[in-house]
Amino acid sequence: MTKNRWIAFRFDNQTRLQEATRSDEFIPDPSLDMEYQRTQVDFGKKGYDRGHLCASADRLYQQEANDQTFYYTNMSPQRNNFNTGVWLALEGQVQSWGRSCTASDTLYVVKGGTIDKEEQVKEYIGGDRSKPVPKYYYMALLFKKGDSFKAIAFWMEHTDNKPAKTIKLVDYALSIDELEEKTGIDFFPSLNDNLENALEATYSTKAWPGLE
């Protein structure tokens, strides 16, 4: 199957920096055989954008890291209105939170699209079922500030609807537990069980500046 399920990265005092420039050179990932990667042909067949999972603007601390965001292994097919609308808006908000990190802070980010359940696949590209298009996209966030933690998730349907003039990201928010139920993924398994259970069961939009 030539589809990435999810990616994970973090913002911290080092990776929050903005010292690189956007390369815009879409290239194959040299670490993976081409038979397991999408190409421009796959995206162009049905008019999909090459949607970044890890955004170019997520990795500006180093040029090599930014260049790697243009690997085809980081691309997911997205309708243009979605890619440049609600997805872009959420990317920008996450980057704002990530770049607020100081020396003792870390924002852990997981992003992905749904391909494992038939009812969560939008369609397939090509003549077989090896290239699914996600019907939903999501993000899971865990913020560590000193000894305190907070978590939140987002779930959005992948449509080609024209974005609203004012995008309310709060409308897409949910708890990590709710996202895990939808995706079947255990997002932050390294946390202490008691802490994980408490963090993932609920969320507060007021705890995330700019969300309300």
Where are these regions (language model features)?
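Short, His- and charge-rich active-site/binding loops that engage polyanionic ligands
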Residues: 1-50
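Domain-level detector of nuclease and nuclease-like folds
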Residues: 32-212
